[in-house]
Amino acid sequence: MRILLYNIRYATGTGPAFHLPVPGAGYLRSNKQVLADITQFIKNEDPDIVGLVEVDTGSIRTGMVNQAEFIAAELGHYSIYECKYGTESINTLVPIVRKQANAFLASPRVHGERFHYFDTGIKRLIIELELEEAVVFLVHLSLKYRHRQAQLRTLHELVRGSSKPVLLAGDFNTFWGDHEIYLFMQAAGLKSANTASLPSYPSHNPRRELDFILYSAGIEVTNFRVPAVRFSDHLPLICDFEIRAGAASAAA
C-alpha cells in the first residue's frame, strides 16, 4: 500500500508573489492552477491513502470549491474531512478560517472514521481512519512547543490504545526535527519511515523536518521518498508499506 502526506497550504501557491501586496496576503488567494497541479501530482503517484493538511473545504477563497472533494473525485477516492480548530473554537465562526481543514482520501475499504480533539493548541483535530488491518491518524500539531508536548501525550494514548497496527502522519511543526519526538516515538512504539531525516520545509530550500509518517510494529516500510515538487511551502512524503500477516490480531 502507499500513503501520501501533503500539507498543500490551501493550494495558495508559493514564491515572492505570495507575500504581495503585504506579507501573507497569498493566504487569501487560492490558485486553480496550483490545485490542478497538486491533483495531477497526487494522481500520478497513485496512492491508496492521502493525508491532506491545510485543505480548504469550500470558502470564498476557493470560489466555494471543496479541495478535498475535488481531489478525491479525480482520484476516485472516498474523502473524510473536518475543520481543524475544534467544535467550540471561535475560528469555526470566522469566514475562510472555518473552512480550513485536514482530510483523508482513501481507496481501500474504510471500516470506520472518528474525529478526536486535543485539549490544547489552536489546531486540535485528529482524524482516525480505520482500515481492515490498520488504523491511520492524521494531525497538524501546534506551533508552540509546550502545546505540542501535551498533544503528543494525547497521541500516545490513542496509539497505545489501538487494537490494530498504526500509521501516524501529519505536520508536526517540530522545529528540531525527529529529536523533538524521539521520546514520544519510543514510548508509543513508533518508528519514522524517514530514516534519513530528510527535510520537508520550506519546499524551495528544505532545511527542517516538520512532516512525518510514523508506524508501529506489524507494519513494514518498503520505500520512502520526499519528492521535490514546489506546489506548496511543504514537500510531500510518500511511503510504501505492507501490513504483516496476522498483525492486526496480534496487536489486539
What are these regions (language model features)?
Residues M1-E74, Y81-S89, R244-A252:
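N-terminal, active-site-proximal structural segment of metallo-dependent hydrolase catalytic domains
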Residues M1-L4, T12, S107-H111, I122-L138, ...:
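Beta-strand-turn-beta hairpins that frame and shape the catalytic cleft
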Residues N7-I8, V55, L141, D171-F172, ...:
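Active-site metal-binding loops of divalent metal-dependent hydrolases
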Residues A25-N31, F115-Y117, S142-R146:
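Short, flexible loop segments at the rims of nucleotide/cofactor-binding pockets, characterized by
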Residues E54-E133, R225-A228:
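Structured beta-strand-rich core segments of catalytic domains in phosphoester-bond hydrolases
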Residues M64-E69, A150-H156:
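Charged helix-capping and loop-helix junction motifs
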Residues V110, F115-Y117, E130, H147-Q149, ...:
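Metal-dependent phosphoester-hydrolase catalytic domains
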